[in-house]
Amino acid sequence: MKRIAILTSGGDAPGMNAATRAVVRKAIYEGLEVYGINYGFLGLVNGDIRKLELGSVGDLLHRGGTFLYSARYPEFATEEGQLKGIEQLKKHQIDGLVVIGGDGSYHGAEALTKRGFPTIGIPGTIDNDISGTDFTIGFDTALNTVLDALDKIRDTATSHERTFIIEVMGRDAGDIALWSGLAGGAEAIIVPEESFNMDDVVDRLNKGRERGKKHSIIVVAEGVMSGNEFAKQLAEYGDYHARVTVLGHVQRGGSPTAFDRVLASRLGARSVELLLENRGGLAVGIRENRIVENDISEILKEKHTLDQKLFDLASILSI
């Protein structure tokens, strides 16, 4: 192993730059050459590849987004796309690849591994929906972004004695909604993994009113329904004319938290070590504060599950 490359793919997440920095600096420390691939798998197929030096990743640790850029390239799922990618890797004499991203990125990494090219996956997505790790890079930052918004919205909800609905990201996973809702004291948390009944939500709000509570916050993951649709349905149950805030892509941006920076640094460094050990087809992660690695194929077979105990706790504490 003399030369490795790194790419970021799919939705950007705060901490991707920190992980890239760790890969580059760890690799150079170990005597390797490092190349950056712009625009993910699309850039790989197009040969958009550049050499990275120590200075290339300076002033990156605190920056959100990804300086390697990102793009979605579904054509990489085809044999033609994969063979073009391997052709470019061989052309640049690259011996191993690190891929930072979510589920779709892992599928690309798995495909390259099956074709004999050593590839390591690093979980980078704000949704925290990758198996084999307690946390993904970017989740903690997104969580704190949502919590900051929730706290500010509660101020105005209290002042005007209103119900507010906050729509957060989470197409298939409700971790952002659950963790931010618990941390922010939301009166109701609606996630894709748990069925809900509007009668139960209204009953919870009514009981709060009976105790003198004059405002409430409901956090809704986008994968369940839009915040506006939820507000429309809620309005059919009486005088709950809620205001809606859609946080949208603000959740993806911003300077990564200390947790995400440290996590990204640890995962990035470990991915280089695995390539030096000639161990491809793995995804790194963190379990109980220990860095672990698992077979990417096995990770893709597993479905991320919501922390049921945490969900139950949030329900208990929101009364």
From Swiss-Prot:
Binding sites annotated in the UniProt record for ATP: 11, 72-73, 102-105
Reaction catalysis annotation: beta-D-fructose 6-phosphate + ATP = beta-D-fructose 1,6-bisphosphate + ADP + H(+)
Record comment: activity regulation: Allosterically activated by ADP and other diphosphonucleosides, and allosterically inhibited by phosphoenolpyruvate.
Subunit structure: Homotetramer.
Keyword set includes Metal-binding: yes
Subcellular location: Cytoplasm
Protein's name according to its UniProt entry: ATP-dependent 6-phosphofructokinase
Gene Ontology molecular-function annotations: 6-phosphofructokinase activity; AMP binding; ATP binding; fructose-6-phosphate binding; identical protein binding; metal ion binding; monosaccharide binding
InterPro entries per record: ATP_PFK, ATP_PFK_prok-type, PFKA_ATP_prok, Phosphofructokinase_CS, Phosphofructokinase_dom, PKF_sf
Family annotation (Gene3D superfamilies): 3.40.50.450, Phosphofructokinase domain (3.40.50.460)
Listed cofactors: Mg(2+)
EC number(s) stated in the UniProt entry for this protein: 2.7.1.11
Record's function text: Catalyzes the phosphorylation of D-fructose 6-phosphate to fructose 1,6-bisphosphate by ATP, the first committing step of glycolysis.
Top class in the EC scheme: transferase
PROSITE patterns to which the protein is assigned, alphabetical: PHOSPHOFRUCTOKINASE
Organism lineage: Bacteria, Bacillati, Bacillota, Bacilli, Bacillales
Binding site for ADP: 21-25, 154, 185-187, 211, 213-215
Encoding gene per record: pfkA
Example of a GO biological process term: fructose 6-phosphate metabolic process
Keywords tagged on the record: Allosteric enzyme, ATP-binding, Cytoplasm, Glycolysis, Kinase, Magnesium, Metal-binding, Nucleotide-binding, Transferase
Residues of the active site: 127
Biological source species: Listeria monocytogenes serotype 4b (strain CLIP80459)
Amino acids binding substrate: 125-127, 162, 169-171, 222, 243, 249-252
Superkingdom assignment: Bacteria
